[in-house]
Amino acid sequence: MTVRNIASICNMGTNASALEKDIGPEQFPINEHYFGLVNFGNTCYCNSVLQALYFCRPFRENVLAYKAQQKKKENLLTCLADLFHSIATQKKKVGVIPPKKFISRLRKENDLFDNYMQQDAHEFLNYLLNTIADILQEEKKQEKQNGKLKNGNMNEPAENSKPELTWVHEIFQGTLTNETRCLNCETVSSKDEDFLDLSVDVEQNTSITHCLRDFSNTETLCSEQKYYCETCCSKQEAQKRMRVKKLPMILALHLKRFKYMEQLHRYTKLSYRVVFPLELRLFNTSSDAVNLDRMYDLVAVVVHCGSGPNRGHYITIVKSHGFWLLFDDDIVEKIDAQAIEEFYGLTSDISKNSESGYILFYQSRE
């Protein structure tokens, strides 16, 4: 155990009582718990994502519902369900929990995380969501094979058919449509692509709305990049653009803050100032999109602190019952809404340490 962890444990009671005092006994939400997570050697990338997901209510509710079922052999989802259940059923309202079982399982299942080096929070989020979806799909498949699926359809799909959607997909999955218009015959072709999170490029002194608009900018395909048009049966100049066709329940936006620099032969951090609003409406939607006017509220932000992808630290800010909290491993603090501006990034292009929003979680209104 490190000196930092020992010091943290000594301060647990102080931090916890301070948090309860800051929130106030009358304002403290009923049946809510705010627990920090112990760092097991550069596991802040994991802790920060887990805290963000815990405060994405639809995700938390489904994980806890999974825990309530009679279960099976241990896997990453059972360990996550145990952790969420442990937080949700604590007698105390605030405190610290060691996610030891989850971390051990994670390291056992994926060599990428089986070390004490700093990892990328976005890579972990992607791995976690896909792994949970795979587990749920495999369980559904096994239930069908065992004849345990109640009210089963007699016309079941073939074995090689597309896997069933899970609650992970229902919460996070959106659809992009790639539209290409031939400039000779005006024929428009489109190809759909599903996503669980959306990665967008960042520029200096911009906003999330600007980043999303750039994501869907029209690109002209000409010269050597000409498009083969099936209607013209030849290569033609064309215009290509990406639009959002299906909006997810929770929109996870990944800001591409790490860029490979040829002259340095390594990735460096783009600490650009990117404003992320508390409310968001997407305008880069396709003409046939469902719920065009869907409004989103910011519920969590995973923040990267430092100057590079393999060094630094991750923290999370979340919105819970109308107020904001900062989770820094085992430390939990109440913060003002105005303090969120500190995590937009830096206005200077000079590479230095910064606390910058890295993964944003926006939840749609009912």
Curated annotation (Swiss-Prot):
<feature type="binding site">
    <location>
        <position position="232"/>
    </location>
    <ligand>
        <name>Zn(2+)</name>
    </ligand>
</feature>
<dbReference type="InterPro" id="IPR038765">
    <property type="entry name" value="Papain-like_cys_pep_sf"/>
</dbReference>
<feature type="binding site">
    <location>
        <position position="229"/>
    </location>
    <ligand>
        <name>Zn(2+)</name>
    </ligand>
</feature>
<dbReference type="GO" id="GO:0008343">
    <property type="term" value="P:adult feeding behavior"/>
</dbReference>
<keyword id="KW-0963">Cytoplasm</keyword>
<keyword id="KW-0085">Behavior</keyword>
<feature type="binding site">
    <location>
        <position position="182"/>
    </location>
    <ligand>
        <name>Zn(2+)</name>
    </ligand>
</feature>
<protein>
    <recommendedName>
        <fullName>Ubiquitin carboxyl-terminal hydrolase 46</fullName>
        <ecNumber>3.4.19.12</ecNumber>
    </recommendedName>
</protein>
<dbReference type="InterPro" id="IPR050164">
    <property type="entry name" value="Peptidase_C19"/>
</dbReference>
<dbReference type="InterPro" id="IPR028889">
    <property type="entry name" value="USP_dom"/>
</dbReference>
<keyword id="KW-0833">Ubl conjugation pathway</keyword>
<comment type="similarity">
    <text>Belongs to the peptidase C19 family. USP12/USP46 subfamily.</text>
</comment>
<comment type="function">
    <text>Deubiquitinating enzyme that plays a role in behavior, possibly by regulating GABA action. May act by mediating the deubiquitination of GAD1/GAD67. Has almost no deubiquitinating activity by itself and requires the interaction with WDR48 to have a high activity. Not involved in deubiquitination of monoubiquitinated FANCD2.</text>
</comment>
<dbReference type="GO" id="GO:0005634">
    <property type="term" value="C:nucleus"/>
</dbReference>
<keyword id="KW-0862">Zinc</keyword>
<dbReference type="GO" id="GO:0005737">
    <property type="term" value="C:cytoplasm"/>
</dbReference>
<feature type="active site" description="Proton acceptor">
    <location>
        <position position="313"/>
    </location>
</feature>
<keyword id="KW-0378">Hydrolase</keyword>
<dbReference type="Pfam" id="PF00443">
    <property type="entry name" value="UCH"/>
</dbReference>
<dbReference type="GO" id="GO:0006508">
    <property type="term" value="P:proteolysis"/>
</dbReference>
<feature type="active site" description="Nucleophile">
    <location>
        <position position="44"/>
    </location>
</feature>
<dbReference type="GO" id="GO:0098978">
    <property type="term" value="C:glutamatergic synapse"/>
</dbReference>
<dbReference type="GO" id="GO:0046872">
    <property type="term" value="F:metal ion binding"/>
</dbReference>
<dbReference type="GO" id="GO:0016579">
    <property type="term" value="P:protein deubiquitination"/>
</dbReference>
<dbReference type="GO" id="GO:0005829">
    <property type="term" value="C:cytosol"/>
</dbReference>
<dbReference type="GO" id="GO:0048149">
    <property type="term" value="P:behavioral response to ethanol"/>
</dbReference>
<dbReference type="GO" id="GO:0004843">
    <property type="term" value="F:cysteine-type deubiquitinase activity"/>
</dbReference>
<dbReference type="GO" id="GO:0099149">
    <property type="term" value="P:regulation of postsynaptic neurotransmitter receptor internalization"/>
</dbReference>
<dbReference type="GO" id="GO:0045202">
    <property type="term" value="C:synapse"/>
</dbReference>
<dbReference type="GO" id="GO:0032228">
    <property type="term" value="P:regulation of synaptic transmission, GABAergic"/>
</dbReference>
<feature type="binding site">
    <location>
        <position position="185"/>
    </location>
    <ligand>
        <name>Zn(2+)</name>
    </ligand>
</feature>
<dbReference type="InterPro" id="IPR001394">
    <property type="entry name" value="Peptidase_C19_UCH"/>
</dbReference>
<keyword id="KW-0788">Thiol protease</keyword>
<comment type="subunit">
    <text>Interacts with WDR48. Interacts with WDR20. Interacts with DMWD. Component of the USP46/WDR20/WDR48 deubiquitinating complex.</text>
</comment>
<keyword id="KW-0479">Metal-binding</keyword>
<dbReference type="GO" id="GO:0101005">
    <property type="term" value="F:deubiquitinase activity"/>
</dbReference>
<feature type="domain" description="USP">
    <location>
        <begin position="35"/>
        <end position="365"/>
    </location>
</feature>
<dbReference type="GO" id="GO:0031647">
    <property type="term" value="P:regulation of protein stability"/>
</dbReference>
<dbReference type="GO" id="GO:0060013">
    <property type="term" value="P:righting reflex"/>
</dbReference>
<dbReference type="InterPro" id="IPR018200">
    <property type="entry name" value="USP_CS"/>
</dbReference>
<dbReference type="GO" id="GO:0001662">
    <property type="term" value="P:behavioral fear response"/>
</dbReference>
<keyword id="KW-0645">Protease</keyword>
